[in-house]
Curated annotation (Swiss-Prot):
Recorded family membership: Belongs to the ZapB family.
Organism: Shigella boydii serotype 18 (strain CDC 3083-94 / BS512)
Any one GO cellular component localisation term in the record: cytoplasm
A UniProt-annotated Pfam family: ZapB
Coiled-coil annotated spans: 3-79
Subunit structure: Homodimer. The ends of the coiled-coil dimer bind to each other, forming polymers. Interacts with FtsZ.
UniProt subcellular location: Cytoplasm
UniProt keyword annotation of Acetylation present: yes
Predominant subcellular localization, coarse grouping: cytoplasm
Keywords: Acetylation, Cell cycle, Cell division, Coiled coil, Cytoplasm, Septation
Record-given protein name: Cell division protein ZapB
Role this protein plays: Non-essential, abundant cell division factor that is required for proper Z-ring formation. It is recruited early to the divisome by direct interaction with FtsZ, stimulating Z-ring assembly and thereby promoting cell division earlier in the cell cycle. Its recruitment to the Z-ring requires functional FtsA or ZipA.
Location of N6-acetyllysine modifications: 8
Length: 79
């Protein structure tokens, strides 16, 4: 009878070890996925910052052209 109990205990211990091993593998996969997603977020942030700088530059150019156009229109009205 004690051999039966020992075998059941051994089976439960083995099952626990298998479960722990699977969970460790899953944790590693999730860590890799998390690192990958973190890198994607960082890349997206850099792209956003670059686009914001470009947008500001284009707005400045647009304002410059609008000022020139207003000046030309003002000269045309004077004539």
């Amino acid at each position: 009878m004690s051999l039966e109990v020992f075998e059941k205990l051994e089976a439960k211990v083995q099952q626990a070890i298998d479960t722990i091993t699977l969970l460790q593998m899953e944790i590693e996969e999730l860590k890799e996925k998390n690192n990958s997603l973190s890198q994607e977020v960082q890349n997206a942030q850099h792209q956003r910052e670059e686009l914001e700088r470009e947008n500001n530059h284009l707005k400045e150019q647009q304002n410059g052209w609008q000022e020139r156009l207003q000046a030309l229109l003002g000269r045309m009205e004077e004539v």
